[in-house]
Swiss-Prot record:
Record keywords: Acyltransferase, Cytoplasm, Transferase
Matching Pfam families: LplA-B_cat (PF21948)
Encoding gene (name): lipB
CDD domains: LipB
Functional pathway: Protein modification; protein lipoylation via endogenous pathway; protein N(6)-(lipoyl)lysine from octanoyl-[acyl-carrier-protein]: step 1/2
Annotated InterPro entries: aa-tRNA-synth_II/BPL/LPL, BPL_LPL_catalytic, Octanoyltransferase, Octanoyltransferase_CS
Protein name (Swiss-Prot/TrEMBL): Octanoyltransferase
Positions of disulphide bridges: none
Positions with a binding annotation for substrate: 66-73, 133-135, 146-148
Length: 207
């Protein structure tokens, strides 16, 4: 799996680059993880309802093709896009979501944070507060989009939406939980957990 550290990049061109990568990939194209950070932007998934944006702000809103509802991206949030061919694995998208969640939970545990998933609401939570979101798109058995983990970002813009379509859902970040770490440091811990949790079945890797 190739790891690409792209730094601070605008959302829309990155999304279109993911689409292009997925459209042109072949059976030989290596899977990739794109590690990014975005300037402030709201993204509205395929199931998203505009009324979940509670007030107009200067933050742009992009209607995108991932699953899910509305969320916010901004500086201080670690975003990982997963461009993977599911035909190389023995699991489907639901299991993939659980594996991604567990990789995030494993990463937070490295920092002494106890987190959990929720079978009824994808993402990762600390208590009742959401710390990470997931949203994927599957096309021709290939995935794109991915996860976002709140590290040190300004959480105020979440107050102007119903995060992931849930009114009153509270969010949190690693700095509020006593962790002072850069995005690069958190990515360094998260990537190995993702690689482990998303690994091919053992019988395939031995071939």
């Amino acid at each position: 799996m190739h790891i690409r550290h792209l730094g601070l990049v605008d959302y829309e061109p990155t999304w279109h680059a993911m689409q292009a990568f997925t459209e042109t990939r072949t059976g030989e194209t290596p899977d990739e993880l794109w590690i990014v950070e975005h300037p402030p932007v709201y993204t509205l998934g395929l199931a998203g309802k505009p009324e979940h944006l509670l007030q107009q702000t200067a933050i742009p809103l992009v209607k995108t093709d991932r699953g899910g509802q509305i969320t916010y991206h901004g500086p201080g949030q670690l975003v990982v896009y997963l461009l993977m061919d599911l035909r190389r694995r023995d699991y489907g998208v639901r299991d993939m979501v659980r594996r991604i969640e567990q990789a995030i939970i494993d990463t937070l545990a490295d920092y002494g944070i106890e987190a959990r998933g929720d079978v009824n609401a994808p993402g990762v939570y600390v208590g009742a507060r959401k710390i990470a979101s997931l949203g994927l798109r599957i096309k021709n058995h290939a995935t794109y989009h991915g996860l976002s983990l709140n590290v040190s970002m300004d959480l105020a813009p979440f107050g102007w939406i119903n995060p992931c379509g849930y009114a009153g859902l509270e969010v949190t970040r690693m700095t509020d939980l006593g962790v002072e770490a850069t995005l690069a440091q958190v990515a360094e811990r998260l990537i190995p957990h993702l690689e482990t949790r998303l690994a091919r079945p053992q019988h395939e890797t031995e071939a």
